[in-house]
Amino acid sequence: MAGLKQCVKQILVNKQHRAYDREVKARNLSYDRWIREKEDKLGIEESISEQNARSLTNDFLITVFEGKYKKNEGNNSDFDDFCRKFEIEQRSFTVVSPELFSLPVNIRFWKNLNTDVILMPFYYGNISRIALKFICREFKNNKNLILIYGDEDVVKKDENQRMVRTEPWLKPDWSPDRFLSSFYFGGLIAVRTEAFQEALGYCEREEVPEAETDARSFCYRILFEMIRLHNGFSKGHKEDGVPVCHVRQILFHSMEIGYEQIKDLRLLLAEEKRKEEIYKDVAEAQKEDEGVLLSVIIPSKDNPEVLLSCIHSILARTRTAYRYEILVVDNGSSEENKRAIMEKLSALPETAGMKGCRYLYQPMPFNFSKMCNLGAKEAGGNLLLFLNDDMEVIQPDWMSLMLEKARLPYVGGVGAKLLYPDSEVIQHAGITNLRVGPAHKLQFLDDGKVHYYGMNRGVHNMLGATGACLMMRREVFEEAGGFREELAVAFNDVDLCYTIYENGYYNVVRNDVVLYHHESLSRGKDGESEEKQLRLLREKDILYERHQELYGKDPFYHPYLTMDMLESEYSPAYRYEVTIDMPWAEASLCTKEVLSAREDRCLVVGMECAMDLYKWQYGVSPDKGEVKISSDEMGYYFQGYSFVIGADNACYKKTLLLKNKECGEVWGIALERRYRQDIKENLKDQLNVDLTGYAAKLRKKILSPGVYQFGMLAVDQCSRQKLVNWSNWVLEVDTDE
């Protein structure tokens, strides 16, 4: 009998595996398939044909666009080996050969180009079929544009010898500080010839030593001058006023990963002096080092050892020509700790540059924003640095490097890369604005490796940086209105950065400035209790009510990157993309079934999103949004992951649970399984965890008012086993909904 039971069970297991494998295959999109589907929806027709035409000396390629043809008269016969020419809507375009960038600089070549637009492939590859349409459209619609760049991927053979697209490099919008740090434009740029030749003439007058550099570096230099001459390093980033445009589409297919070919490309050392031109609008008082005073503002309470360790690391390791002061803002340490702090601060050694340390004691409930605002009000500096008391300085030039950026007239907030103590594990490398909320980028990843085309190297423009280490000019802080005091704990730094961006400034994260962050020593982690989770949700509501235009958007994070889950890496969206057109989930009371299940922590319940469906789409509640919907369209959106440790997850059917905390009534919500490559990669020792993700859309009218706790019911389809476990996440259903 036992053998028969085992045989029947194996038949059931095999059946589950077949169904599971089919679903995995259907949900596991490849980048190649996903991007082609995206581009097909753009409706861009491939209407370009190429023809050969004979010049005076040899054959070269002329491209005909939409039936237009420009006869070659041999005017360019001395350099036509390196050119392709075509016309689009009465504009002449010339594509130069990437071979040019491996040869010595030839200024005469660039000066003699007679064309409206130059397309420069910086390495070998192919211009995409949609590129010319987008480039032409942008130049036509914006007369102020002088340069266009786009995204790129790699075309290569897969294991079946088919040519497929892979390795997408999805770039940010115009990022002036990243451009000064590295040539992130990549494989293809398009420039207006007139602007390029104007910058070329400027460099000629400056007697650039063309023989001392390669053509790529030389063009990098010309592009810098071109962008500078057209105010690309200025406050303000309205699309019609910025001379550089990022087309958020794949415009180039490289033969190998492009980043590896230009990652070491830098502006010439001789150009450091030229970069100083960007500072020309800084007030004279700030041009001299002695005119700068940095106020380091440190909020702290009842952490004398941690606080003093932070301050000692500043004094012992900082080497700077700038003057600075330290202000400690204490919101109510005990008398014993207060005395200890005052004694230690009064005994601090004098160091070069440090102009004193003040202790501001004002008992009040914890409010990070209010404490920082108090410190800023009392500070004497024209630059402000907000620093957590659990930070540790580890490099001498950290302050000077941050000040270098913070003093630029177009720069807003300046942050640093933070690591967990005594490790190379990243805690923070900027903040991106995902649909599920702001996220620390690259958190928990190894800083010893290069991540997503250098995102943990060099200098980057980001929408936000953590307030744990955030520097800015006083005028920037005051223009933004300081920290919002209704955001007492969370999102106050994000809100400030978003406001600074909306005011026209560029926020910066310097990955070449590294500090250790002994995170959350003072108040614990957000979301670890029901009270903290609900407070976090309320503060997130305030954030997006204030910044509705930014909800679900980030100019420095490509929309083809993952936006729909809490993502610290830079993963293309084909790995996880939410479609709200999913059917409404079936829901039923299942209190008895849940009570009969075994509660077991081996059933992992991960919640990532539980929110009003309208908020998911628009960032605010229906009464505060501009889009109006009917009551039938109102509901909730749930998303997360779940798996059973040490079991065959292909055999389990899972049901999301919502338990009314007052009456104990339990609702079961049918789920859609989602492919989660990130979970799979982190659970290499677990079986069949490809479809650990889940999502559901629930009509609002099903739930009565109250607070509901989330859980999961997992039923083994090949045995009688039922498991249940509960999350600490809750959903608050208001009485007025």
Regions found by a protein language model. Give the residues of each.
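Basic, ligand-binding patches in group-transfer machinery
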Residues: 51-54, 85, 89, 125, ...
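A short, conserved alpha-helix in the catalytic core of glycosyltransferases
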Residues: 195, 209-242, 247-248, 399-402, ...
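A recurrent flexible, glycine/aromatic-enriched loop bordering the glycosyltransferase active site
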Residues: 167-193, 369-370, 434-475
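Cell-envelope/extracellular polymer assembly enzymes that use nucleotide-activated donors
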Residues: 58-63, 293-297, 325, 495
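Acidic donor-binding segment of Leloir-type glycosyltransferases
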Residues: 76-111, 315-364
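C-terminal, non-catalytic tails of nucleotide-sugar-dependent glycosyltransferases
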Residues: 2-58, 259-294, 422, 436-461, ...
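Short aromatic/hydrophobic "clamp" motif used to bind/position activated sugar donors
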Residues: 117-118, 384
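Conserved donor NDP-sugar-binding/catalytic core segment of glycosyltransferases
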Residues: 130-164, 241-242, 391-436
